[in-house]
């Protein structure tokens, strides 16, 4: 009975939001090319390795805060820059679950100007590893394209964790620009900028592809974090994982 009621409720919600925003359709390659500007950035003189930065005008972003993020222009879900995960890997945009469920929230925030979008579902909301290896490298890609403070807003997976605020401080960004994606799941932007993910590949496991993360990005992050004045050396370092939501990879301090 409860399952049937939930199913009916979801159908009603979807129909209502389809009336408001239109039924979502997967965009064609032609629509994508006509509406998405693509720029390339490089981290070194090695022109064999580049990263795309995607720019879209007048669009929406909706996240289910799980495994799907939809970047929507008019009523079209844009492939390549929307995110859909399955079995710990990036899958084809046609499998984005938001195509089925629709956007289940009204627009929570409208932003005038250019929004840098870094959200990617649940993976980086609380997970330190995904934050360090996914979100910060995407910030580095965006920084190669444009001064981060030139963006009018920066849409992040979460800004509640201390490690998130601490690591962002090394980029010198005005915190007033931050939008908390864990609370604000549906936005409209006059202009949206999305940097390419540093290592995700379609139908490739994340644990396999993370080994291919660009050494130039790692070195750039290392330079940012190590550029600290008057650091006192310590014989030992205490690492605390007690606030982690994950019970694997725990550390014993001696």
Role assignments for model-derived ranges:
Residues 1-254:
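The feature primarily captures lumenal catalytic ectodomains
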